Amino acid sequence: LLQEVVRALRRAGGVTGPRYCAGTHIHISAEDYTPQQIRNLVNIFASKENFLWDALQVSSARESYCHKMDKQFIENINRKKPKDMEEIKKLWYRGRMSEQFQHYSNSRYVICNLHSFFQHGHYEIRAYNGSLHAGEVRSQIVLALAISNAAVTKKYCSPHVSQSDNMRYSFRVWLLNLGLIGEEFKNCRAHLLKHLEGDIAWRHPEDGIAARARLKEKRELEKQAAREQRNEPVSDNSTQAENVPEENNEPTESQCDGVEEELEMSM
């Protein structure tokens, strides 16, 4: 269904993407979230936003409409550990409560927008570039749902900012931890990882080089052992035994039939 919708937009002449300063905004219902789950949610974005910025290729032209999380808000929500939504709301608007009734509140222009949550009961993810590629759109939705699931199911998510010198490997591990495992999510992982650099299989690339060298050496040794086994000389006793004719070494009936047919054909 999603693929058909995207194709219909293309056929109708739809255009989108960073060059048009257009983004994909995904809204997820959070009416049943607890204050702790909202805290988990914003902590996930705060800790992984550097990864997300690179993986999602957030356009510089769109950054005025999609900032990273407000560090002061993240610090306050984790220090005060609010027990109800009104406390979170006060922290979000920094006490300027009249903003909650403004559609274009400045607080909405962040990667994870809680302004829409306080207004309509659903939060908004604003980091994605616009796309008319069904696979990319699907990967955006799947990632949003996986983050939502982590916020709801995990007891606590740390706001500590993740760093890595091998972004491709670290982001892939995070996707697997979110549950994007197996063939079902293979295309999603491919789209989300395609802009990142690094060794996807090894945390430290030099470990991968060493492992591949060891594997190559092992295979060469196995091939050499197989060649030596094929070229192993046969002992004299076994040669003599092979050359001694067996008693009653008469041809079988089927062998005789074959010889008779050949003789008849040659006549």
What are these regions (language model features)?
Residues 1-18, 31-267:
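C-terminal accessory/tail domains of diverse enzymes
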Residues 20-24, 28:
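Short, conserved phosphate-binding/catalytic loop or strand-edge motifs used
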